[in-house]
Design a protein with these regions (language model features):
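Core segments of cupin and vicinal oxygen chelate
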Residues: 2, 9-53
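Residue-level preference for short coil/turn positions at secondary-structure junctions
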Residues: 1, 54, 67-69
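Vicinal oxygen chelate
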Residues: 3, 5-12, 31-35, 46, 63-87, 107-112, ...
Length: 125
């Protein structure tokens, strides 16, 4: 097993708002994906499936609710997570943990997204 995690889903209440938020702070495109469930909106983060990269999505459906409780998803903060973190507030989120040094493991930070989820960033710089 190369990765303990291979997929994550972040629940959202407003798909378009969340898609814009994550696209803005991470400077990437969330790709709309058709799911057979008619009452579901699904948008995938880019990932390298050929090299067993970890992927994920934002999901709007009634059975999934945004939360600050539970597991924390750590998104790739790039070379320096301050770049993404600096966009959180202007994109509609709230920084709840600034860039924090975790020794040889790099840096982490946490924020509340536009949907009310507690999400984190990780980078080595």
């Amino acid at each position: 097993m190369k990765n303990a995690i291979n997929w994550f889903e972040i629940p959202v209440n407003n798909y378009e708002r969340a898609k814009k938020f994550y696209g803005t702070i991470l400077d990437l495109e969330i790709t709309d994906y058709h799911m057979p469930e008619k009452n579901m909106k699904y948008g995938m983060f880019p990932y390298d499936m050929e090299n067993t990269g970890v992927g994920g999505a934002i999901v709007q459906m009634k059975e999934m609710k945004p939360s600050t409780d539970g597991a924390t998803v750590y998104l790739n903060g790039g070379d320096d997570l301050n770049v993404a973190l600096g966009k959180v507030a202007t994109a509609g989120g709230q920084v709840i943990m600034p860039k924090t040094d975790i020794d040889e493991n790099g840096f982490i930070a946490q924020f509340i997204d536009t949907e009310g989820n507690r999400v984190a960033l990780h980078s080595m710089g």
